């Protein structure tokens, strides 16, 4: 579905996503909710709403929609959908500074990571950011370095740049 609003974001000085336009992102979230229907796109739409709600700072709504996506993908036995949305939920717990909940999800996801190697770099990037905010700089740096190795192989410059930002931030704050 094409969202007719600016849903882009940048990263702030603490490596958190920040909407290019908060007002437009909120309009985009409302648009997604208006078009949310049970069906083949339900899980994907709930996941997107959960991500955008987190970026917009509405963490309770983020958790609600990510949990709805996880439930949907669990019912349809979609392992990839479950993994992606549990990773997103861990990210929301991280933003809430609920590190035990975030770490429990990261630990669970680590067990299924061998089945979903395409998401390994995203896993290590998000886990690294959580560990960084938790004050575990050495662990965070090792996760960012793992993410960077994978991303260099993939060759996606935007992802490589975001991981290098994380490494630079980590090195300057330890």
Give the residues covered by each predicted segment.
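Intrinsically disordered, low-complexity regions
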Residues: 1-174
């Amino acid at each position: 579905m094409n969202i007719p609003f600016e849903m882009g974001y940048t990263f702030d000085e603490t490596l958190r996503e920040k909407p290019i336009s908060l007002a437009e992102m909120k309009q985009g979230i409302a648009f997604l909710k208006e078009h949310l229907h049970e069906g083949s796109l339900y899980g994907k739409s709930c996941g997107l709403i959960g991500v955008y709600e987190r970026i917009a700072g509405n963490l309770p709504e983020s958790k609600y929609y990510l949990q709805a996506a996880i439930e949907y993908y669990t019912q349809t036995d979609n392992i990839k959908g479950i993994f992606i949305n549990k990773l997103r939920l861990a990210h929301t717990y991280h933003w809430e500074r609920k590190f035990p909940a975030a770490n429990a999800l990261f630990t669970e996801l680590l067990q299924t990571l061998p089945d979903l190697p395409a998401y390994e770099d995203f896993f290590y990037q998000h886990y690294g950011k959580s560990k960084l905010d938790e004050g575990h700089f050495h662990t965070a740096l090792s996760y960012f370095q793992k993410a960077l190795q994978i991303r260099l192989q993939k060759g996606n410059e935007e992802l490589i740049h975001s991981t290098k930002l994380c490494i630079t931030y980590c090195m300057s704050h330890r």
